[in-house]
Amino acid sequence: MTSSSSPSRKALSKIACNRLQKELSEWQVNPPTGFKHRVTDNLQKWVIEVTGAPGTLYANETYNLQVEFPQHYPMEAPQVIFVPPAPLHPHIYSNGHICLDILYDSWSPAMTVSSVCISILSMLSSSPEKQRPTDNDRYVKNCKNGRSPKETRWWFHDDKV
């Protein structure tokens, strides 16, 4: 997998283009609550504004997600990261990488950008405290040069937050 900063990213397949155009059309009609697609002319890279849910630690806070779609989306998961500054959360690293199983091992082609966004908002909303992952400094140090979070071998051990 190439990093997000790689200029050699492959063009989307016809299936991926059709799927993303459909998802974008549906999003424009019925966006998930708390999210706003920031319009660009690049179907392969979306920027999505996330607003924390009312009554949570992140209420009224706004963050940006960057979603990069691989050539064979939806058969392959998109790369989803928070554009720094990332929210303080036990599963979100300071470089924006997100430890969430559906972005990696548990990805299914039935998932959509909307369902991923809802999962991320749910993860934020359920957090009882704002803090970085305990291994944040070590992980970020090892992710230099724009390494993709999809190159990480994640260990999903905590589903409480």
Swiss-Prot record:
GO biological process, alphabetically ordered: protein ubiquitination
Keyword presence, Nucleotide-binding: yes
Described function: Accepts the ubiquitin from the E1 complex and catalyzes its covalent attachment to other proteins.
CDD domains, alphabetized: UBCc_UBE2W
Active site: 99 (glycyl thioester intermediate)
Protein name per its UniProtKB record: Probable ubiquitin-conjugating enzyme E2 18
Cysteines joined through disulfide linkages: none
Protein family membership: Belongs to the ubiquitin-conjugating enzyme family.
EC number, as in UniProt: 2.3.2.23
The protein's enzyme class: transferase
Keyword presence, Coiled coil: no
Record-linked SMART domains: UBCc
UniProt pathway annotation: Protein modification; protein ubiquitination
InterPro entries: Ub_conjugating_enzyme, UBQ-conjugat_E2_core, UBQ-conjugating_AS, UBQ-conjugating_enzyme/RWD
Highest taxon above the source species: Eukaryota
Reaction it catalyzes: S-ubiquitinyl-[E1 ubiquitin-activating enzyme]-L-cysteine + [E2 ubiquitin-conjugating enzyme]-L-cysteine = [E1 ubiquitin-activating enzyme]-L-cysteine + S-ubiquitinyl-[E2 ubiquitin-conjugating enzyme]-L-cysteine
Keywords for this protein: ATP-binding, Nucleotide-binding, Transferase, Ubl conjugation pathway
Domain UBC core: 15-161
GO molecular function, one term: ubiquitin conjugating enzyme activity
